[in-house]
Amino acid sequence: MWRHTRKGDKYVTVIIDLTPVRDGTGPARLLDMVEGRSKQAFKTWLNERPKAWRDGVEVVAMDGFTGFKTAAAEEVPDAVAVMDPFHVVKLGGDALDRTRRRVQQQIHGHRGRKNDPLYRARRMLHTGSGLLTQRQIRRLDLLFADDRHVEVEATWGIYQRMIEAYREPDRATGKKKMAALIKSVSHGVPKALVEVAQLGRTLTKRAVDVLAYFDRPGTSNGPTEAINGRLEHLRGSALGFRNLTNYIARSLLETGGFRSQLLHPQIG
């Protein structure tokens, strides 16, 4: 989101070059920004690139929006689509949050309050099991000892398996763990776990893209999120932008990899 106004498109598609990260030559850099967040916006941008440039694209890392995947498949068909870990884990985290809120309503009849066990545990539930303190482990044991929380515990287990797959040092093993996870939620999920079933449908549909990450190091969208953070800071420092062209120009100057060249131009 580049502006907070009622009129006009509030969103832009941010296009990042991850090549320096993959090659170890530097940080990711902003390539361009396109008004709108749609298949057509990204497809048009790709179509406007020279054919030689498009033919050179090997990997496209993206979030879960299927419009980007379709656009890439049509304009750079030889490129491998990769759904990055940040957004895959976010899908799992969102499923966990929705389960927690639903169970909270079923038990207490209201949204979470500061003294409600599930509400108090909301951040702890998102912590990787390997990073939990002994005190947090005891709190979780107490939380899951309540049979009314069994659906939260089941969804939490899926979320933890997802994190474990990505944190596995051996990529081949990590890929096997993720494939097993996707298979386990693709069918036979209890009807009560509606959020897990929905997650399973999404992961099954994008399984090839999710698993592709383990074969291609350096294709995480993490650097993209880092650039998005810098752009958010830029908008705050400028007290907002009213003109998209100016916003794109300032963004390219800030994160397009030009600053070092402007500050330290080569002579001769």
What are these regions, as identified by a protein language model?
Residues 1-61, 66-74:
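RNase H-like nuclease fold core
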Residues 3, 28, 86-89, 227-228:
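Alpha-helical hydrophobic packing sites
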Residues 4, 19-22, 79-80, 96-107, ...:
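Conserved NTP-handling cores and scaffolds of large molecular machines
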Residues 5, 32, 58-62, 82, ...:
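Hydrophobic alpha-helical scaffolding
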Residues 63-66, 73-116, 225:
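Conserved beta-strand -> loop -> alpha-helix junction used to position metal-binding or nucleic-acid-contacting
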Residues 115-196:
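Helix-loop elements that line ligand-binding/catalytic pockets
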Residues 186-268:
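Basic, amphipathic alpha-helical segments enriched in Lys/Arg and hydrophobic/aromatic residues
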